[in-house]
Amino acid sequence: MAAQGRLITDTSNFFDIGPGDTLLVAGRRYLIKGEEREYRFGIEDPKFWVKKAVDGRTGERKIIKLRYDESFITDLGRIKIRCFRNSWKESDILKLVGNHVSFMHGVTYLDDHGNPVRVLDIVRGTNFLNYIGGFRMPHEKYFRTELPGILRKLIDAFQAIAFLHTHGFRHGDIRNDHVIVENGGGHYVWIDFDYEFDLPENPFSLDVFGLGNLLTYAIGKGFHDYYMIRNETYIYHDLADRLELEDFSLLHRSRLTNLRKMYPYIPPMLNNILMHFSRGAHVFYESVDEIIEDLNGYLSSL
């Protein structure tokens, strides 16, 4: 266990930095209160490189992200893609976006050993995963009364990703828990853009497919995987018998993309947007702007 009450100037060993320690960086002191945790699939995982802290000068609560180098391989269809963390990229994006309402805000300092220390403002709100899960109503009512407004907000968020792409950056890890629905104004705010990936042939494709996942989640009021469809027949009835491989996601191969087979009131125009991300797709979106154009076309038809 880390000793308490130490003054930390080297963040290389982030596991050894714990509650009660004070981080000294660029002449500023931050009292460490603990680690952030990630909640996914019912599992709570501590993120030891992401610290909860209090600014010793202002008393404000902050999130501090320390340098953490990791990599893994993911699949896009039959293509294997190396993904990795890049603290410097996130630092560059923080500079680029400034006070842009669609991104988290923060500043990067260097510790005594040259490690980047990102000091982030807390985005107060609910992540998109929980926000959509909070609609306690039948899907058809949700689809007709709530979804149009959600899609308009998503378009704003998608435009923010297009802004990154225009400047040569990728978000790198687009997920429904990396969008925060902000308290008050309701802006959709992107967080956690330190992931990067190697795919020079189509440099923005993982971001584009990540946006497809957000759309699938929003339109379906949750994800619908084959295991659920096959086993929860009291909800899905005979849907499993009517599905083909082409109805599922190219990126997440057991996730239903052809939602019109489940909810026949979804118009073909909207469902066709989703089908660009399916295993049966013959045409894929090459840019965020193409998705935005089709979403605007659908909303204009309502």
Go through the PLM ranges and name each one.
Residues 105-146:
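Conserved structural core of kinase catalytic domains
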Residues 161-176, 181:
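Catalytic-loop of the protein kinase fold
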Residues 188-270:
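C-lobe/activation-segment region of protein kinase-like
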Residues 153-154:
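Activation segment signature within eukaryotic-like protein kinase domains
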Residues 279-302:
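Terminal C-lobe "cap" of eukaryotic-type protein kinase domains
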Residues 92-111:
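Conserved HxN/HPN-centered segment at the entrance to the catalytic loop
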Residues 37-95:
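ATP-binding glycine-rich loop module of kinase domains
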Residues 1-41:
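Juxta-kinase regulatory segment immediately upstream of eukaryotic protein kinase catalytic domains
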